[in-house]
UniProtKB/Swiss-Prot annotation:
Biological process according to GO: immune response
Subunit structure, as described in the record: Homodimer; disulfide-linked. Interacts with IL5RA. Interacts with CSF2RB.
GO MF annotation terms: cytokine activity; growth factor activity; interleukin-5 receptor binding
Family (UniProt): Belongs to the IL-5 family.
Pfam families reported in the protein's UniProt record: IL5
Function, as annotated: Homodimeric cytokine expressed predominantly by T-lymphocytes and NK cells that plays an important role in the survival, differentiation, and chemotaxis of eosinophils. Also acts on activated and resting B-cells to induce immunoglobulin production, growth, and differentiation. Mechanistically, exerts its biological effects through a receptor composed of IL5RA subunit and the cytokine receptor common subunit beta/CSF2RB.
Residues modified by glycosylation: T22, N47, N90
Keyword field contains Secreted: yes
Source taxon at top rank: Eukaryota
Main subcellular localisation: secreted
Top-level taxonomy: Eukaryota, Metazoa, Chordata, Craniata, Vertebrata
Localization: Secreted
Chain's gene name: IL5
Protein name per Swiss-Prot or TrEMBL: Interleukin-5
GO cellular component terms listed in the entry, alphabetical order: extracellular space
Length: 134
């Protein structure tokens, strides 16, 4: 009986893995998620009493933890089912992608020259893509 339970759980896990498309390019996943968000915006706004913290500044890449905490709050307060479930599944996949990318932020020591090149690129992005507040 116990072996049957283990095999059932293994089969369930395997079917779950194959049910989630892992080969979708992230850009396509983000586009689909934006479409789903637009489609379900009215449903998601339904709870007018719910308050979710929103980061003050516009540098979204610095606030991923806060954004995903807000998504978790919204998900826990939203009735699941249908395509809204797909929205939250996509957001979960995007979070996994971002978490994987964050792991690339460290762990490798390089020469000072390589660090300075990276720093210069970082400051260039800040200069062109960020809204710098006075």
């Amino acid at each position: 009986m116990r072996m049957l339970l283990h095999l059932s759980l293994l089969a369930l896990g395997a079917s779950y893995m194959y049910a989630i498309p892992t080969e979708i390019p992230t850009s396509a996943l983000v586009k689909e998620t934006l479409t789903l968000l637009s489609t379900h915006r009215t449903l998601l706004i339904g709870n007018e009493t719910l308050r979710i913290p929103v980061p003050v500044h516009k540098h979204h890449q610095l606030c991923t933890e806060e954004i995903f905490q807000g998504i978790g709050t919204l998900e826990s307060q939203t009735l699941q089912g249908g395509t809204v479930e797909r929205l939250f599944k996509n957001l979960s996949l995007i979070k996994k992608y971002i978490d994987g990318q964050k792991k690339k932020c460290g762990e490798e020591r390089r020469r000072v020259n390589q660090f300075l090149d990276y720093l210069q690129e970082f400051l260039g992005v800040m200069n062109t893509e960020w809204i710098i507040e006075s």
